[in-house]
Amino acid sequence: MTVFEIPADTRSKQRQASNPNQSVWVSANAGSGKTHVLASRVIRLLLQGVAPSKILCLTFTKAAAANMAARVFDKLAQWTQLSGGDLCAQVVATGAPMPGSEQLTLARKLFARTVETPGGLKIQTIHAFCERLLHLFPFEANVPARFEVAEDLRRAEFLRRARREVLAETSSSGGALHAALQRITDECGPDAFEDLIKEAMKHRAILRAPFLHEPIEILRRSLGLAEGRDIARIEREMAEDGIAPARWNDLAVLLDQGSANDQKKADLFRKAALTYRSPRSEGEFGNCLDCYLAIFFIGKGKGSKAQRLLTSGLMKKHANAGTELYAEQLRLDGLRAERRTAATFDRTRALIEVASAISKRYGEEKAARGILDFDDLIEKALALLERSDARWVLYKLDAGIDHVLVDEAQDTSEAQWKILEELTGDFAAGRGQSPGPRTFFAVGDEKQSIFSFQGAAPLMFDEMRRKFAAQFTAGAQPFAHVPLTLSFRSAPGVLSAIDKVFEHGDHKTGLVAANDVWMPHQALKHQLPGLVELWPLAAAPSGEDPRAWTLPLDLLDAQDPANLVAQRVAQKIAHLVKPGSEEFVHDSQTLGPRPVRPGDILILVRTRGPFFEAMIRALKRSQIPAAGADRLELAQHIAVMDLIAAGRASLLPQDDLALACVLKSPLIGLDDDDLMALAPGRAASLFDALQASADAKHSGAINKLARWRARAGGSPFVFYAGLLGADGGRRDIEARLGPEAGDAIDELLRLAIAHEDARSPSLAAFLNDLAGLEHSIKRDMEGAEDAVRVMTIHAAKGLEAKIVFLPDTCGVPWPRRDPKIFRLGTTVPGEETIAWSPIKDFDCEVVAAARGKARDAARDEYRRLLYVASTRAEERLYIAGFHGVKEPDPGCWAKMIEGALANEAGIQTVPAFWNGEDHILRLIS
């Protein structure tokens, strides 16, 4: 293959995007070189003599910031050693004009100048920028002078403590908060309560209102609930303001004349009349109302339906009674809707009261220790910048920032956009101390916004582009919108298939702005062969499961369709990487064909569930090198579970379960036969039986336990450092579980050190903290060894591979993932509150609309997730899926892709490699 020449049009766009004299908004397709453009712009700013301290480059993750910094510094370091001609070519490659001798001299000095500048070139996450800003102005921002930033683990610990203390105080004290807590627990159990509070804490800005009645009154207005209207009053109106209770028995007599259905309603009228008396208990009135409503409606909640009230024969005889009953049904239906609204208000008010108390205690916990969390950084920095004297703050911040660059702009949250607006407020008007232009640069792709759970607001991407363009244009400052559509990554055949999928029907909804057309991708590697395969979906067999036992929920067996797909993928990969196979990919360096390696392959899934584990198991059973999980749930990792068991057994050897676990672990290495020689028929504890045994293996175990017990009184780090180091624990664990376990071990040791920094060290307290731990480790898969990578799509964003498998294409995001809490607003800008609705049947009209909006947003992100996944592929894309007895949802990825490509001209039908019955659809270019 030949070296690919970048088209002149693309080079022109790159030069325009990196032009340091104008503000630019770049909309970049996947693989279109946005990182290159951003780095080139930074370098061109430096080439123009802009001080490094005047440049602020904000990225979404620490890894992205490190990658960006490495690109810039590596390039500048390289320039220090180049000859004049080579340096000229490198400078021009950034988009800058041909340099003169002075500029060449400056280019050679840029590396030293950038490194030696106090504070250096600022390429960081927005949270890191906010942290630095608050450290510089703690008094003005009203934060502790030497605050620390709490990581997720410590934040979760503070939140658990705040929740525990508030619940303990509330349960014993009574009062309004006790009643609110009781109202919440009437709706959910202990586990659901914990999840509910976590979800509520995502709306802390609402919970931290100076006066609690403010969000509650906003809630009332948002729901459209009139003052004074509550559940009790509405229910009284249901029973008393329509057909008078005194007439219920008369209507029962009338209905007795009709059919069996009429007579059932007659019985309900009598029961309602019987339980309606004065004085009456709350329970009796509830039974009365249930009977009365059952006459008019089938079922309860929002999904209940109005039913026929009189049979045709009875309607002819008593038309007036029928008219009266249908009018009553209409009246009751309106009151039921209002009751759902009042119930939503009552339920949410209780949640706001309890969650606000927990939020307040959580804030006190942090303040007492001089700690801020990540949300605080954004909130406090925004409050500081919104002050009337914020210009002075910005000027003092390295004597002003003249150039702001934003990477991954599609993942920026609403609050973060406000910070960016404050930072660049004077840029559009041309105000400031700098003699040169002050510029704003943003690059992103709304099609790749998949982090809504972290606050990303994809709809704001286009909105903010238009807003910045209007502001700079109004201030007579140059502003350009540059689209980058040329892919430097994927083969034209892969890109063509992706275009066809998203051009089809409404598939582009949520990927492009309203009324915008789909912009087809262009491929730089126009001669690179591409392949897309659609495998038939694996379905669960219909009929009764022939197995005589029930498997655990998280375990798949050979009969499960998900396991079948995992085996097929592993079988295909084994063929691809088999020595002597005729399968080839094209080398990125030589541009020629070479055999497929395991590291060329990326398997992407939506979630880390049973299929994720089944896929890794299938690869290992096929003896295919696999990099393991991309993210480790620390407390659930087997190595950490073994180490926790070792700690517990050292503190209390009589804990038979902990001791048995550690005896079978790699730390000691006994097997089932060894335990069977000890455990059955023992007179005392397992530890006593172990001590009494003369077996050499058992003696070795006792000696290890003795060494561990001698260290158990010290700090957790000393305990585990000795166990893993001098005692050989790390070596033994990694020998059995593989090098992946090393990441979990390192994180456990880091947490042990953090535990010592935060409190008086204690192994027992540390193990107690680990018991409720919700902490995961993100492993670096980009630099993984030559092994197949199995990752979630979120974790793979920014990565690429020669060959990509999408084996999990039948799942859909709704309604299982519906939130329980919905954000509501009023007609007044800035007025926001929340509403809690546990299930759809409880929804009032306003919440039903909010739920529908949330589902639409989830569907949009679901489609964007498919775009991100499919654009990771360079040469080959294999698509598979599995489902249960029922057909998959028509809106799932598998159906989207099949509908767009199944009838495509040139598609081939080939026999499946796993049997002689199924067929694969194949597109080759």
Task: Label every PLM stretch briefly.
Residues 124-130, 159, 351-402, 416-419, ...:
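Conserved helicase/translocase P-loop NTPase motor core
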Residues 38, 99-104, 132-138, 329-333, ...:
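Active-site-adjacent bridging/hinge elements
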Residues 121-133, 184-207, 351-358, 372-381, ...:
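Core structural elements
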Residues 815-856:
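Conserved catalytic motifs of ABC-family nucleotide-binding domains
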Residues 1-70, 74, 145, 151-153, ...:
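Conserved motor-region signature of P-loop NTPase helicases/translocases
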Residues 19-21, 59, 63, 76-287, ...:
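Conserved ATP-dependent motor core of P-loop NTPases, especially the RecA-like helicase ATPase domain
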Residues 2-3, 29, 54, 190-372, ...:
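Conserved ATP-driven helicase/translocase motor core recognized via long
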